[in-house]
């Protein structure tokens, strides 16, 4: 089958649905690829790069006659008219916001797979295009804020004076919010975050931000991987928190969105008016109405008190090269599910929950949204397990303890009387090493067990040296040789395993 990649026609859209790297992966699945002339130009992908990857370059008319169309945005009426019956379209569709588009797609009798309908389950993460684009949006939001902000993000002490670090508030700790937290923290800002889902607190803190909480308990998870609409009391408390923080912070990044509905209004004009001059608000929900009252989609609004409100709706397109690569990889991973035989043909198997979830039109028939349980469920209240009755243990007779100690003492005295002086010296050191080693190892933090394993390589090396010396003894005692061989084998396992674990540990601290 032939896969066509057209040029995106929307204004300010710089992405493309395939890159030279993803073309190579598609060809390995048995498909042919044709890319429209200059489709990847805005994303820094020349036609020559696609040709070298194995694709063909064609006209718009040739592209839309392909068996499968890979696209970023939903098609226009003219593009739909050019598609042939029975073809497959893979792109963002947004069926709930575009009922008229769905009617036109079903009338064409084609198959439509919506990348915005990927189920939020673990197995579908590799093709979750929404998360890929949200990650880029969160990162780019910080870059845009830094561009408009008139100072450093990180604090500095210079000969000219002290520069305080910027304070950043991120509202919403989803994929975009976490990306914004990471980017702002890496630039040296003091980052705070709020989310209605208490289960994301650890994620926020692990990214280096402070998690803000309100004195009101309400479960924020909706069971579909998104935050649910909260009660009026919760929203009132949250608005009080936003108003308090607005007076302190320099930058606010809002990411709150409700699928298929207008974005919730979180930042009022009064809050913006209370912010310091030069502050910046980045509204990632501008496309669906915005979280801020001052937001205007696609524009930067400067208020009377010199606060800039950024309402761009094309954050992923502002990083077109990376966005195209991630989106193209998502499409390749979807194609692997559609073409498990790698024979260049697709099979929309509804037994696969992922394919069932993304399919919105099949053979001209609109498919209702699938009810798929998400992998990340909100925490359920656990019932306390019944406490088992404790059986009273009888106290140990102290005479038994003293008897054991006396027996050990007698055994040691006997060994001291019959054993050579060298053995007694080594035995004493061995006993002391066991006692000291026990208390040292068991008092080490769990986080340091991996580095501790690396240190044991040296100890195992000493064991191997001792065992090798025993094997070389002229007596030729078979029992001693066997024990020495076992010691070498066990110590070698510890050494090789220790080096392997150490290598993996050190790799965690390398970039790239």
UniProtKB/Swiss-Prot annotation:
GO biological process: NADPH regeneration
EC number(s) per entry: 7.1.1.1
Record field: transmembrane: 401-421, 422-442, 452-472, 479-499
Keywords from the named record: Cell inner membrane, Cell membrane, Membrane, NAD, NADP, Nucleotide-binding, Translocase, Transmembrane, Transmembrane helix
Pfam families: AlaDh_PNT_C (PF01262), AlaDh_PNT_N (PF05222), PNTB_4TM (PF12769)
Subcellular location: Cell inner membrane
Topology Cytoplasmic: residue spans: 1-400, 443-451, 500-512
Topology, Periplasmic side: 473-478
Domain of life of the source: Bacteria
Reaction catalysis annotation: NAD(+) + NADPH + H(+)(in) = NADH + NADP(+) + H(+)(out)
Binding residues for NAD(+): 125-128, 175, 195-197, 225
Statement: the UniProt record of this protein carries the keyword Phosphoprotein: no
GO molecular function: NADP binding; oxidoreductase activity; protein dimerization activity; proton-translocating NAD(P)+ transhydrogenase activity
Region (Disordered): 375-394
InterPro entries: Ala_DH/PNT_CS2, AlaDH/PNT_CS1, AlaDH/PNT_N, AlaDH/PNT_NAD(H)-bd, NAD(P)-bd_dom_sf, NADP_transhyd_a, NADP_transhyd_a_C
Membrane topology: Multi-pass membrane protein
GO cellular component: plasma membrane
Family stated for the protein in its record: Belongs to the AlaDH/PNT family.
Subunit structure: Heterodimer of an alpha (PntA) and a beta (PntB) chain.
Functional description taken from the UniProt entry: The transhydrogenation between NADH and NADP is coupled to respiration and ATP hydrolysis and functions as a proton pump across the membrane.
Name of the molecule in the record: NAD(P) transhydrogenase subunit alpha
The organism of origin for this protein: Haemophilus influenzae (strain ATCC 51907 / DSM 11121 / KW20 / Rd)
């Amino acid at each position: 089958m032939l896969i066509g990649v057209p040029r995106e026609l929307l204004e300010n859209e710089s992405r493309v649905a395939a890159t030279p790297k993803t073309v190579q992966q598609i060809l390995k699945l048995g498909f042919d690829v044709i890319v429209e002339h200059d489709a990847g130009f805005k994303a820094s992908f020349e036609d020559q790069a696609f040709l070298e990857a194995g694709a063909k370059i064609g006209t718009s008319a040739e592209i839309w006659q392909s068996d499968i169309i890979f696209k970023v945005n939903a098609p226009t009426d003219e593009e739909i008219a050019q598609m042939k019956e029975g073809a497959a379209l893979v792109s963002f569709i947004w069926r709930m916001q575009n009922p008229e588009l769905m009617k036109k797609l079903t009338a064409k009798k084609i198959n439509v797979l919506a990348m915005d309908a990927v189920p939020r389950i673990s197995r579908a993460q590799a093709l979750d295009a929404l998360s890929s684009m949200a990650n880029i949006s969160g990162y780019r939001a910080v870059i845009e804020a830094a561009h408009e902000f008139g100072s450093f993000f990180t604090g500095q002490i210079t000969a000219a004076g002290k520069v305080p670090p910027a304070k950043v508030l991120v509202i919403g700790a989803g994929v975009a919010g976490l990306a914004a937290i990471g980017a702002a923290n890496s630039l040296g800002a003091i980052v705070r975050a709020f989310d209605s889902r208490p289960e994301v607190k650890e994620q926020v803190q692990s990214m280096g931000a402070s998690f803000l909480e309100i004195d009101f308990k309400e479960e924020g998870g909706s069971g579909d991987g998104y935050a649910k609409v909260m009660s009026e009391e919760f929203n009132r408390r949250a608005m009080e928190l936003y108003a308090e923080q607005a007076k302190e912070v320099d930058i606010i990044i809002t990411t709150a969105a409700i699928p298929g509905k207008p974005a919730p209004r979180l930042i009022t004009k009064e809050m913006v008016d209370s912010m310091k001059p030069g502050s910046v608000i980045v509204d990632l929900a501008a496309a669906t109405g915005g979280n801020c009252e001052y937001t205007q989609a696609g524009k930067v609004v400067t208020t009377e008190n010199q606060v800039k409100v950024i309402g761009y709706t094309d954050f992923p397109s502002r990083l077109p090269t990376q966005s195209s690569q991630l989106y193209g990889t998502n499409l390749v991973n979807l194609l692997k599910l559609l073409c498990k035989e790698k024979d260049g043909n697709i099979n929309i198997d509804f037994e696969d929950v992922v394919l069932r979830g993304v399919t919105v039109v099949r053979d001209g028939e609109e498919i209702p949204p699938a009810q798929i349980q998400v992998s990340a469920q909100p925490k359920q209240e656990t019932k306390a397990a019944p406490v088992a009755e404790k059986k009273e243990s009888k106290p140990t007779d102290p005479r038994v303890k003293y008897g054991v100690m006396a027996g050990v003492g007698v055994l040691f005295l006997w060994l001291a009387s019959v054993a050579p002086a060298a053995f007694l010296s080594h035995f004493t050191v061995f006993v002391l090493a066991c006692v000291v080693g026990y208390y040292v190892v068991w008092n080490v933090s769990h986080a340091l067990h991996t580095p501790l394993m690396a240190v044991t390589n040296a100890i195992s090396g000493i064991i191997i040296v001792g065992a090798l010396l025993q094997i070389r003894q002229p007596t030729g005692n078979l029992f001693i040789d066997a024990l020495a061989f076992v010691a070498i084998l066990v110590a070698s396992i510890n050494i090789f395993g220790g080096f392997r674990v150490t290598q993996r540990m050190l790799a965690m601290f390398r970039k790239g």
